[in-house]
Amino acid sequence: MPASPTATAAEIKDVNTRYHDAAADSYDAKWGIDYGEVGQAQVRGKLVKALGHEPEVFGVALEIGSGTGYFSLNLVQLGLIERATATDISPGMLATLGRSASELGLEVETVCTEAETLPFADDSFDLVFGHAILHHIPDLGRAFSEFERVLRPGGTVAF
C-alpha cells in the first residue's frame, strides 16, 4: 500500500527532504532531544520494547532515517553499538548529526540515501534499525527487502 493515495514516491521524498532540511538546525531543541542520561534511558527503553528483551551489544549497525541522530548517538554512548552508520534523505539532518557526534566525541558515518536503495554490500550489518521512520518511506516492501539484503545472517531488524 502506498504512503499516499495521490502523491508519487518522488513527491513524498521531496517534501520530506525539504521539510527536514529546513527544520534540521532547530530540530533537537524543538523536540527536546537529549544525548545525556535521560536520552540514553529513553532510547534503551524503546530498543528493549522493540526487541522484547534486553539488547545485546551489536557490532556494526545501520540506522534508517536517522534524522539528527537521537538513536544512533545514544546507542553508541551506551556501548550497545560498536560502529554506527546513519542514513537519511535529508543532508541537513545528517549535518546536524555530524556536529552533535563531534561535540560528543563520537564517530558515526553518515550517508545520504533512500531506504529503498541502500548503497551497501550484502551482509554488512549486525543491526538494521530505525525510529519514527516507517511512515516516511513510500515503498516499505522494497525498503524491507533492502534491510534484509544488507543484514548479516543472524542479524537483527528493529523498528
Where on the chain are the PLM-derived regions?
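Phosphate-coordination loops involved in phosphoryl transfer and adenosine-cofactor binding
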Residues: F58
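Class I SAM-dependent methyltransferase SAM/SAH-binding core
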Residues: L62-I64, T68-T117
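A short glycine-rich, Lys/Arg-flanked "PGG" loop and its adjoining helix->strand segment in the class I
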Residues: G141-T156
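A conserved beta-strand element that flanks and buttresses the S-adenosyl-L-methionine
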Residues: F129
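Short N-terminal helix/helix-N-cap motif within the alpha/beta-hydrolase-1
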Residues: G92, I137-R142
